[in-house]
């Protein structure tokens, strides 16, 4: 009976070690935006953090407004009968918000370039780190 307990404990320990080591083979730790990224100096890290914080502060209100307009747009489409003039007006507002967000992104990219921060490869084709078709906007 004692021998069977030891065998069971050894098997459980080996199983736990095997399950814990699988993350080593899964290329963990990269995350989005880390593919082929050059290591940043401490000055670049500080500059990147400031640029990122500034961009977030400027863009978060616009992003929230865009989400609200999407809900409004969908509600107008679901109305019976749909009011095309209201739908077109909300669509135009959404386009203006997207344009404002794009302008902020360009300003952020310019600030990063001026700070000497490499842009990296981004999310890649399909929106998931460089491969496949199952990313953002693909079903």
Curated annotation (Swiss-Prot):
Gene Ontology cellular-component terms listed: periplasmic space
Pfam families xrefs: Metal_resist
Highest taxon of source: Bacteria
Cited InterPro entries: Metal_resist (IPR025961)
Signal peptide stretch: 1-26
Subcellular location, record wording: Periplasm
Keywords noted in UniProt: Periplasm, Signal, Stress response, Zinc
Job description of the protein: Part of the Zra signaling pathway, an envelope stress response (ESR) system composed of the periplasmic accessory protein ZraP, the histidine kinase ZraS and the transcriptional regulator ZraR. The ZraPSR system contributes to antibiotic resistance and is important for membrane integrity in the presence of membrane-targeting biocides. ZraP acts as a modulator which has both a regulatory and a chaperone function. The zinc-bound form of ZraP modulates the response of the ZraPSR system by inhibiting the expression of the zra genes, probably by interacting with ZraS.
Family, similarity comment: Belongs to the ZraP family.
Record-given protein name: Signaling pathway modulator ZraP
């Amino acid at each position: 009976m004692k021998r069977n307990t030891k065998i069971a404990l050894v098997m459980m320990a080996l199983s736990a070690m095997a399950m814990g080591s699988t993350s080593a083979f899964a290329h963990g730790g990269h995350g989005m935006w880390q593919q082929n990224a050059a290591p940043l100096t401490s000055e670049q890290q500080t500059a990147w953090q400031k640029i990122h914080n500034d961009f977030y502060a400027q863009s978060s209100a616009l992003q929230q407004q865009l989400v609200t307009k999407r809900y409004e747009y969908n509600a107008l489409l679901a109305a019976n009968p749909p009011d095309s003039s209201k739908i077109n007006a909300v669509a135009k507002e959404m386009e203006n918000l997207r344009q404002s967000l794009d302008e902020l992104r360009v300003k952020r990219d310019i600030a990063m370039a001026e700070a000497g921060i490499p842009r990296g490869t981004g999310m890649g084709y399909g929106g998931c780190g460089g491969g496949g078709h199952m990313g953002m906007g693909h079903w």
